[in-house]
């Protein structure tokens, strides 16, 4: 542990370094970021503590610019940006400094800078400011994060998704559905995880997405509703039982099973209306056989026996029709 007096001297030295950087000394700025990019956590913490102690709005504006553009004034903020791991540590340190408050004055200073940043003419600064406000769970960031999902590059799309997930508010659901529809790559995957983290806060966005023009997005919305026990998903969710993708078929079956009796009529309709291919037979059997209710199992016993074997489409359809007719009687 650093003795108290020595620690104070170190902070005075770092404060002087920061002041020189703010006055235009690029070598001092480079040294500041050498601290923030260090693998030594103690060095990073000393500099982060000093950022808070200085209480200078110019510093927070510079740091916002560094996160958005990797620039200190008009030059690269740090030579170590050329090392991806060091650059990631710099960004993480900046984010941590913006999110953690040591006083009310510290908090107000940063929020003022970030709100100004969201109105900047440079989209990259807007996205960075909204991202940091989102990490602080400030819902005023949502419209700019939504814009980032529409227009930003891949990195800032992922950061926007991260911030929306952290806020865990129903207003975050619609932008995440938009991100889900972007592609089938990392943005899609990140949005899917974020929606899952929102849990019930995503419900209204899921319901709206049941009418999405993209069938795959409708299925994701239905699956999300199924996970939170909302039976409005069932009629769309069952489409996943005959999807070409095996992972979608099995994920569909698991969610339908958790919905138990409320999912049965829709599954029966699928078996009545569609040819019983082997993939559909397996997925339907898995959904029905995995339902937790003993009463449901007993009612479905004739159909489960047929689906367990190599039944014909006609056999399964006939039994499904009888069960459906009797289901609510």
List the model feature ranges, each with a label:
Residues 108-110:
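Short alpha-helical hairpin
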Residues 2-23, 30-37, 42-54, 61-69, ...:
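Structural detector for internal amphipathic alpha-helices that build alpha-solenoid repeat scaffolds
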Residues 297:
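Active-site glycine/GP-rich loop and adjacent strand/helix microenvironment
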Residues 67-69, 302-309:
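TPR/TPR-like (Sel1-like) alpha-helical repeat modules
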């Amino acid at each position: 542990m650093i003795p108290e007096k020595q620690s104070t001297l170190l902070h005075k030295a770092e404060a002087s370094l920061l002041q020189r950087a703010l006055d235009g000394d690029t070598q001092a700025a480079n040294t500041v970021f050498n601290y923030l990019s260090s693998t030594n956590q103690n060095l990073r913490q000393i500099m982060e503590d000093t950022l808070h102690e200085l209480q200078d709005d110019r510093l927070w504006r510079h740091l916002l610019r560094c996160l958005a553009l990797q620039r200190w004034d008009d030059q690269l903020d740090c030579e170590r940006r050329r090392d991806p791991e060091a650059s990631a540590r710099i960004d993480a340190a900046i984010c941590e400094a913006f999110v953690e408050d040591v006083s009310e004055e510290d908090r107000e200073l940063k929020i003022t800078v970030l709100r100004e940043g969201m109105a900047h003419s440079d989209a990259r600064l807007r996205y960075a400011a909204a991202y940091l406000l989102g990490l602080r769970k400030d819902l005023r960031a949502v419209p700019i994060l939504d814009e980032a999902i529409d227009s930003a590059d891949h990195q800032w799309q992922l950061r926007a998704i991260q911030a929306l997930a952290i806020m865990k508010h129903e207003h975050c659901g619609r932008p995440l559905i938009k991100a889900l529809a972007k592609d089938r790559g990392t943005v899609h995957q990140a949005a899917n995880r974020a929606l899952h983290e929102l849990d019930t806060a995503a419900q209204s966005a899921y319901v709206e997405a049941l009418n999405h023009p993209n069938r795959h997005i409708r299925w994701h919305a239905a699956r999300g509703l199924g996970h939170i026990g909302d039976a409005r998903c069932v009629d769309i969710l069952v489409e996943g039982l005959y999807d070409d993708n095996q992972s979608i078929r099995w994920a569909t079956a698991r969610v339908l099973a958790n919905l138990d009796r409320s999912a049965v009529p829709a599954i029966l309709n699928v078996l009545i209306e569609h040819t019983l291919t082997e993939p559909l037979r397996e997925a339907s059997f898995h959904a029905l056989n995995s339902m937790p209710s003993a009463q449901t199992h007993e009612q479905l016993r004739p159909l489960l026996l047929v689906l367990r074997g190599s039944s014909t489409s006609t056999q399964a359809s006939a039994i499904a029709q009888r069960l459906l007719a009797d289901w609510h009687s």
